[in-house]
Amino acid sequence: MILREEKGFTYGARTRFSGSRLPGTFTASSGVRSNTTEESVNIFKNLMTAYKNPINEEDLKFTKNVTLRSNARQFETLGALRRMISNIANYDLPFDYINNQEKIVREMTIDSHNALVKKYIRPDEMIYLIVGDAATQLNGMKSLGFGNPVILDKEGNSL
């Protein structure tokens, strides 16, 4: 919300967890104007670091509502239904797994939320991938304290 509503840097920023039978990833992403890259990355960094702070009841309620409402999208289109059925088959899930997930979300407490954040959100282990012109962006990225950047060409080869 900061990047879009407060700063006007982007039309949207998103986060997601993805997984399979193997451990998955947490991704936070956004497309921003080149002249806002450094500040935008710093906002992401600060937000991720702020997850260490305990959540309050209002934020927990908001998160629960967003999560529960987003489940409705799993039933909106034939493609979404196909993906849900595919997940049931691929991961040997019970047919009512959505109900089970919603129950877990409804029963989430501040303490259980904070324990999950502590376990899975580890900003010091995150990889920041910035796509842009190194000539204009590299110095700004160095100033954020991420260590030495790895610069890749468009084919993914180290430069």
Regions from the language model: what does each represent?
Residues 12, 16, 96, 136:
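Short, electropositive, low-hydrophobicity segments enriched in small/polar residues
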Residues 1-38, 83-84, 102-122, 148-159:
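Non-catalytic beta-strand/loop surface segments
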Residues 1-10, 20-21, 53-111, 146:
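Short acidic/His-enriched helical or mixed secondary-structure segments at domain edges of catalytic enzymes
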Residues 14-74, 142, 155-158:
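M16/insulysin-pitrilysin zinc metalloprotease superfamily fold
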